[in-house]
Amino acid sequence: MRLKDKVAIITGAGTGIGEATAHKFVREGARVVLAGLPDDPVKDVAEVIAAGGGEAEAYLGDLSEEAAARACVEAAVRRFGKIDVLVNNAGVFIANAETQDYRVEDFERTIRCNLRTAFLMTKFALPHLQKTRGNILFTGSEAGISGSARFTPYGASKGFLHAFAKGVALEQAHYGVRANCVCPGPIDTAWTRGPGGPLSLEIQKSIDQMVPLGRRGSPEEIANVFAFLASDEASYVTGALWLVDGGVTPAKGMAGAMVPEELRRIPAVTLPLRHAHDGLRGKHVHLAEK
């Protein structure tokens, strides 16, 4: 159990990658504080963990608000006495429009959720992480490396997190605190599959052909990398961007079209996930199709 006796805060823990990371960390021995917006099924995830014998505390609030972020950190320390790991996973992908048509309110929501939340949680958690020589993990994106047409603010927000993670890693190294960023490609969640999301059905159909491995990733595959980076096995890893994207970042053309059908299947889920495709609930996605 790589995370035995460690305490982790996971933001955006109600659905998708956050839900999978919560279950993976508990399976590896961690005790967790699961944070999410009031409409997110965070309490349900905590109840499933508790039913399986794990320890989880649910915290509901808008972590882009200073008071809520501070209170989340305080709740973790009050419940478990310390913090070893912070997973800055919360974020939104809420609009599909060329930059001249991108609504200012969607831009501001993206900045608040994706940047401000991560900054505030990092700020308030660091004094506790310095005591435990803990580590911080961020959910970045391949879009933050390559850029993304029609989602320019989203890609830019992830690019900020990449640079922020590196800066925190350099700054906090003398405290023994590590910081790393995982950069997923297209993952099988509500953001990339089904109606009502930011991707058109045409783009959704082409994803598997654009990814060299010929398929979307699963939330569990991202959680597996988070678990390694959070563990002492990664003690010499800091300031790193970990691409977990099926090869889409260096790819050109439709490399995935050559992958045989049997390799296109997403691996079977081993974690008790119930909300992998619920991430859009209450997020008010805006599409400006042309």
Regions found by a protein language model. Name each.
Residues 7, 14-16:
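Conserved glycine-rich cofactor-binding loop
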Residues 28-44:
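Conserved glycine-rich Rossmann-like NAD(P)H-binding loop of the short-chain dehydrogenase/reductase
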Residues 97-99, 103-108, 207:
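Substrate-binding pocket helix/loop in short-chain dehydrogenase/reductase
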Residues 122, 157, 165:
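Active-site helix of classical SDR
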Residues 127, 170-174, 235:
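Alpha-helical segment proximal to the catalytic Tyr-Lys
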Residues 141:
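Residue(s) in the substrate-gating loop at a strand-loop-helix junction
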Residues 181, 201-237, 242-246, 272-290:
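C-terminal helical subdomain
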